């Protein structure tokens, strides 16, 4: 059941026109995971929208967190010009051991790579929500968007990764996507190749997975008609185990592991 904390909600430009931002943060053992990274991204978006973040937001956040009677849950912070609100809910993503792998497919909706809003986590999520609903009705776990040039970008609520010959590949931010927190983590921990990718490239890769802050890393077993392996022996599974060990550490990581192959432990930091 979702729990809300509404603090004198005012119908400002955020709630009337979408000029607001939010962050969805997993809480693990009573602590928000990589809160600093989420707050940094939130501040960046609010600055772009011309919104000042309240000086006492952190006190409200911790008051809300400490008021919860459970250790593992999802915290959502919703911010606009005149509002700061929090909600909580359960994290419904299964553990890696119980994950059969996602089935994903291309959406008919295109990402507009020329829009600056696509790179920010704003209230403007209509395309993603509608595409997600349609995909689920068709038995698809996550729709994947191409941009106006036909390049792969991201999922409705996830970033997209591939593995080929032990190397990680992901579309660049310039393709028109939100730079996710787990995406940033992987790009700092491993020598990720960011390059334009097209639908015809999908079948050339060995593995595929999605990322976001709640799922961590989600293996993909089928992308359209292309099947990928899903097991505890894949490099995707090894990456997930590394993430599970790392998520209790501070973010960001200061060392980029050039040449580090997926699945190998990151050097001590």
Where are these regions (language model features)?
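Ordered, amphipathic secondary-structure segments that act as subunit-interaction surfaces
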Residues: 70-81, 85
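Helix-start/capping segments and mature chain N-termini
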Residues: 2-53, 59-66, 83-260, 266-269
